[in-house]
Amino acid sequence: MPRVKRGVTARARHKKVIDAAKGYRGRRNNVYRIAKQAVMRAGQYAYRDRRNKKRVFRALWIARINAGAREHGLSYSKFMNGLKKASIELDRKVLSDMAIHDKVAFAAIVNQVKANVA
């Protein structure tokens, strides 16, 4: 059985890591040992933040809905309670977009909610 030299394989593996570290600062983008650690850490951050993104956006939507509801004299919790009672099934993403960009439609929803809360 012939001897296998690892030069080609090692070069390919190193190149893959160095390419993934493109754009990093300092030695993180061209020294394999350091780049490997940086790429692994970047992957961990990416994995974590794909999950955190969902929480962050939900918090943003809630803040926007709260601001829009308070302009019409309702708190967020009373507004959401009224939505459930009025059986209006719009999600927070759509409601926050309406509160920012379509104030007339949002005001109409708030008026429906006020009728059900009272």
UniProtKB/Swiss-Prot annotation:
Q: Which UniProt keywords apply?
A: Ribonucleoprotein, Ribosomal protein, RNA-binding, rRNA-binding
Name of a matching Pfam family: Ribosomal_L20
GO CC, alphabetical:
ribonucleoprotein complex; ribosome
Give any single GO term for biological process.
Answer: ribosomal large subunit assembly
GO MF terms listed in the record are: rRNA binding; structural constituent of ribosome
Does Zinc count among this protein's keywords? no
Q: Which InterPro entries does this chain map to? A: Ribosomal_bL20, RIBOSOMAL_L20_CS, Ribosomal_protein_bL20_C
Q: What does this protein do?
A: Binds directly to 23S ribosomal RNA and is necessary for the in vitro assembly process of the 50S ribosomal subunit. It is not involved in the protein synthesizing functions of that subunit.
Q: Which family does it belong to?
A: Belongs to the bacterial ribosomal protein bL20 family.
Please give the name of this protein.
Large ribosomal subunit protein bL20
Q: Which organism is it from?
A: Ralstonia nicotianae (strain ATCC BAA-1114 / GMI1000) (Ralstonia solanacearum)
